[in-house]
Regions:
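Membrane-embedded transmembrane helical bundles of large multi-pass transporters/channels
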Residues: 1-35, 41, 91, 135-379, ...
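Structured non-transmembrane domains adjacent to transmembrane bundles in polytopic membrane proteins
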Residues: 44-164, 376-544, 550-569
């Protein structure tokens, strides 16, 4: 490692040149990486709802649709608007009554099902827009944007395709502000906590490289989710900042011991790499645990963030040293007083009251452990967006005028008789909450010659070996009511056609709930196991990993229990990923504290003295890192209009503070009280490592 460090110091100008040049392909890769705005596409492909979704897309071209509610518009204007919409690139068809019959025919002469489906309250009718490509495709989103410019007054555009376009527009609008607020808030904390005025700017410049490389290398994944895109910069900044802080502190220490700055940096690089190897591996392992999710959104976030941490470590020991040495004179020239002190008084208090602190903490923890499992969770994208968006208003209008709060798409084989399908429609219509059921057979009736049905209708209701039944529900997606309704409908469908499926946002969200419940357990287990193993290997201990993980898991329990007491509803993805993110991001604090405690014990101090010294000397680093992470994420939470991102960032920011307090107050007390257990369950706990250190330094 020493030879590598010497090479980094010697060729620092070349390293900086290469680092800046690599920003060019990174920018190209970042721009070329597609962003996916549809969470439901991350569901496992073997679920019935996803099988049905594929059939809707491939056979009926209905997976990607939009509904336009038109109120009080004269027929001639409506037909003119319909033609304009059909001319938009990406639109396959705009379906209305005029595609079936002469619109001059009185509506009273139409079948009751058609009247109910096509006409609603407030003198309204409905246009169905079918797109060529999937809802989350760029082609469909561009088409939606164009259609919005063609709508007349009192026209409301709703459906998943429109909501996804709204999501894209909102994320693109807010993303620059997320980055600005995260960088600005982090800089503020760093200016207040570091002596040099130049160092925070170098840190931000140093973090530019791994963040840019991370986004650029996402091109190899093909696409990432908008959630990953929105969180990656903020998380990477917050998670890897402590690596930079650690390198700086080591360099400042070594400068006092070495004859010149280059030697000091070589030593700082070696010691930093040794120190952050365990903490970075635990962070990476925590993020990779998200890959255990069946919902592949977890793999998306996990891979991007694990890659980001790995790149952050590399840039910390390769690029940042080159930056610091290049600007060392300015770093030394411009200095100011800091306001984040060493917590000396707190360190003496904690070491003198260890037992009461741990006992009180356990008592306080119990209600939060109980509460975290009772926190309400929501699963719909609809609920996480501002309610004044075009797609939200339009979708609400569908429910208001047509009773289409949720639409179910039922696919049964086309060898079922007209009578069987009509009977099934009648049974589904009797299910609580179903407002309307439409199928080809329910419209035409048994014995009707389907060759007389217009092709525009046939290709919507029968295609690819399937018959389509559309059932509208008054229940909201993601609720217990609609999930019970779906269970009842599935039983009715399977009784007639064992291979029949039900899909649509309601069915897919129900599957999402079931998958998420399993994922929550799997991710927690795998992240805890991975971190336990890495810490156990690093410290050669059985008890230390249990103690450190328990301290962070306690902080997580408090964080996730607070929403229950405040009556806050969380997005489902937050309940899955927050534990992993908080564990991976803040376990570094506990490793730093424990490493210092170990050093003090080896030096010959008593457990009480070691606890006091470790808290006093680690407090500034932990406070700086924790407050930086808090500032970056709470800033995003404060400005985001998307409830999903706001909730995740608020939980992360609060989690950083809670973990920081637990590590600064509870962990030193716990280490002191468990010292006997640690000594007897840790290999060579009290043996000085100076010989090993000298050996590695020669190597």
């Amino acid at each position: 490692m020493k030879k590598i460090a010497q090479g980094i110091v010697r060729f620092r100008k070349l390293i900086l040149t290469v680092a800046f040049l690599l920003l060019i392909p990174s920018a190209i890769g970042a721009v070329a990486t597609r962003i996916n705005y549809d969470i439901l596409t991350y569901l496992p492909q073997d679920l019935d709802s996803m099988i049905g979704e594929v059939a809707l897309e491939d056979d009926f071209h209905l997976a990607s649709t939009g509904m336009i509610t038109v109120e009080g518009l004269p027929t001639n204007e409506l037909i003119a608007m319909k033609k304009d919409i059909e001319a938009v690139p990406g639109v396959m068809q705009t379906f209305w009554l005029s595609d079936v019959i002469d619109p001059s025919i009185p509506t009273e002469m139409l079948p009751a099902d058609v009247q109910q489906f096509m006409f609603g309250k407030n003198d309204s009718t409905m246009l169905i827009v079918r797109f060529d490509a999937p809802s989350a495709s760029d082609e469909t989103m561009n088409a939606v944007s164009q259609i919005e410019t063609l709508l007349r007054k009192d026209c409301f555009f709703g459906g998943m395709s429109v909501i996804l376009q709204d999501t894209k527009a909102l994320v693109n609008q807010e993303m620059p502000f997320y980055i600005l607020i995260a960088v600005g808030a982090s800089l503020l904390v760093l200016f207040l906590s570091l002596e040099s005025t130049i160092t925070p700017l170098l840190f931000m410049l140093g973090l530019l490289f791994p963040i840019a490389y991370n986004f650029g290398t996402n091109i190899f994944l093909g696409q990432i989710s908008y959630i990953t895109e929105a969180l990656a910069t903020v998380l990477q900044l917050g998670v890897t900042m402590d690596f930079s802080i650690f390198l700086l502190h080591r360099y400042q220490e070594e400068k006092e011991l070495r004859s010149n700055n280059e030697e000091a940096m070589v030593s700082a690089i070696c010691k930093t790499m040794t120190s952050i190897s365990a903490s970075s591996l635990t962070t990476i392992a925590g993020f990779l645990a998200l890959c255990a999710m069946r919902l592949t959104l977890g793999r998306d976030i996990g891979i991007v963030m694990a890659k980001g941490v790995a790149l952050g470590v590399i840039c910390t020991v390769v690029v940042l040293p080159a930056l610091i040495l290049s600007f060392d004179r300015l770093v030394e020239k411009y200095k100011h007083r800091t306001i984040i002190p060493k917590l000396t008084k707190l360190s003496y208090f904690v070491s003198s009251h260890a037992a009461p602190i741990v006992a009180i903490f356990i008592l306080v923890l119990v209600p939060f452990i109980v509460a975290q499992s009772k926190t309400d969770v929501y699963y719909t994208l609809f609920d996480s967006l501002p309610q004044d968006l075009v797609g939200i208003v339009g979708t609400n209008k569908l429910g208001e005028d047509f009773g289409m709060t949720t639409s179910h798409f039922i696919l049964v084989h086309d060898d079922l008789t007209a009578t069987q399908v009509s009977d099934l429609c009648d049974e589904i219509n009797d299910v609580d909450g179903i407002t309307q059921v439409v199928s080809l057979d329910s419209i035409t009736g048994p014995g009707f010659d389907t060759s007389l049905v217009p092709d525009s209708v046939m290709e919507i209701l029968q295609s690819g070996g399937y018959k389509l039944i559309l059932a509208n529900s008054s229940y909201k997606t993601g609720t217990d009511a609609i999930n019970g309704q779906l269970d009842q409908m599935i039983r009715l469908i399977k009784a007639v056609d064992p291979e029949g499926v039900i899909t649509g946002e309601g069915a897919m969200t129900k599957d999402l709930i079931e998958v998420a419940d399993v994922d929550f357990k799997n991710v927690n287990v795998w992240s805890i196991l991975a971190v336990l193993v890495i810490i156990a290997i690093s410290f050669k201990s059985i008890s230390i990993p249990v103690l450190l993980v328990a301290s962070i898991e306690a902080a997580i329990a408090i964080n996730m229990g607070i929403p229950y007491f405040t009556g806050t509803e969380l997005p489902f993805i937050a309940s899955i990923v927050i534990g992993t993110i908080q564990l991976g991001a803040t376990v570094d604090y506990s490793i730093l504290m424990t490493t210092r405690y170990h050093e003090e014990r080896v030096f010959g101090r008593t457990p009480k003295e070691a606890a006091q010294q470790s808290l006093e000397h680690c407090s500034q680093s932990i406070l700086t890192s924790g407050l930086t992470f808090f500032a970056a994420t709470v800033g995003v939470a404060a400005i985001s209009k998307m409830e999903l991102l706001k909730s995740i960032c608020l939980l992360i920011s609060r989690g950083a503070l809670i973990s920081m307090v637990v590590i600064l107050v509870v962990l030193p007390a716990a280490l002191m009280l468990c010292d006997w257990i640690i000594r007897h369950t840790t290999l060579k706990w009290m043996v000085p490592e100076s010989a090993n250190a000298k050996k590695s330094e020669k190597e």
